[in-house]
Amino acid sequence: MFDREQEKAMSARNDEEELDNVNRRSVLLGTSSLVAAAALTSSALAQTQKAATPSAASSGGTTGSKPNILFIMGDDIGWYNVSAYNMGIMGYRTPNIDRIGREGAVFTDWYGQQSCTAGRAAFITGQTPVRTGLTKVGLPGAELGLGPLDPSVADVLKNHGYATGQFGKNHLGDRDEHLPTAHGFDEFFGNLYHLNAEEEPENPDYPKDPEFRKRFGPRGVIKSSADGKIENTGPLTTRRMETIDAEFLDGAKDFINRQHRANKPWFCYFNSTRMHIFTHLKAASQGKTGLGIYPDGMVEHDGMVGELLKLVDELGVANNTIVVYTTDNGAEVFTWPDGGTTPFKGEKATNWEGGFRVPCLIKWPGVIKPGTVVNDICAHEDFIPTFAAANGDTDLVERLKKGSTLNGKTFKVHLDGYNLLPFLKGDAKESSRKEFLYWSDDGDLMGLRVSQWKVAFMEQHTEVNPKTPLGVWQGNFTKLRAPMLYDLRADPFERGSTSMYYGDWVARRLFLIVPAQAIVAKYIESFKEFPPRAKAASFTINDVMEKISTGSPGKN
């Protein structure tokens, strides 16, 4: 059952009601796949290591001024592809990424999402992606993208006087209205999709009709600004892929230098295209490790992280700059050797920990003690409330529920993130986040974690074979009549279900079911006032048939 502190945390997160006020008997088994499948409780957990009280505490840095924010996001990089996590077992090192954790914190239980678009949407909006509809990987020509009713992290920071720039992959929509510069960023220079979509026009059998390319093909690498200017700098060809991250790096460094000269606090969001398939390396990066294309690409990627850290040092602003390194989703394993590595079960696009658990390292001078290891649950949705709190805005989540103005625009939304600042500073013993919900790219609730307990009520075991050559991307999820239960402390890699004693172990823990239903019901309750902005996209004919039956127009 739930201890009182966890009940209070859950209640404060969702609404003003106490968890005990939920009429558990009114939560009927079988009335909703979201509720009926949930079987979990928040048993108290003593974390092994906490973020310690810093030597020079302040609301957001050592100087008391607004902290700069350097946010670096990799692409499809596995938990074990960063040497701070693998301790060298992969045969190569990532010293610059590791440095962020050494001078700050390494997080073991940080959650992205199950795919590129979803993971980036969770960070940018502070909402679980099912609310925005951005759960499915965005494709060229698709209608769905980041909408005008959802505030972005850039909107939040613009409200506090920041200069905002994004460089590299976006993947939150194909159209002009989806570009970062329509959502709070002063400038953007980057690509809009995953790499394998960018190179499709180079296939010899790609349609030659220019109208097809115009309607369904990838746009080029875009340079845009908040004043409405949009420039297509040309296609992202396989040759350009060899050096495109260097282009983005130059743009990011130029942005930081300009804002430093202007004496403005800055938020730089750098999105590497490494290590999404298909990897194309310049000659100088090939063979660096002797271990293959992925390790070589990681070493190149780590070097670019090092260049950004070096610039921050040279400008003398390291003590007032938050540095974050993370990635969007779990490793894509089935494309190995051009694919990532994770010790967790599953991979990108699955319901398992391997699909959602991501590396995350944060350096925050004056807030996070160097060398910290954090085992508490945290997620990409938590960045917006935390960055707001770093600027003295501690009630953003509640204010946006009632309606609030950010960057000259009025929003009324339900943020799903938590303010982690009190925990990171050492003022709170535990992370505010006690739970995480696992949504599929189709918008189904696949599982729930509270404290160390996890339930999986959908599962996927698809391997690459002649019937499903694209592995997990083609295989269906199986809905379970009775959920599977895991203790992610005793069994973090979800292998307990292979034990001959697993059935007995689960049978002794059926007391967890009803409290879990209460949590899910309370979460779903928020959708009454804050319904999803859009339905998740589909790769199948179902979406087309639904549009035909409802008379929904297609893309013009």
Q: What are these model-derived regions, one by one?
A:
Residues 2, 11-479, 483, 492-556:
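Formylglycine-dependent sulfatase
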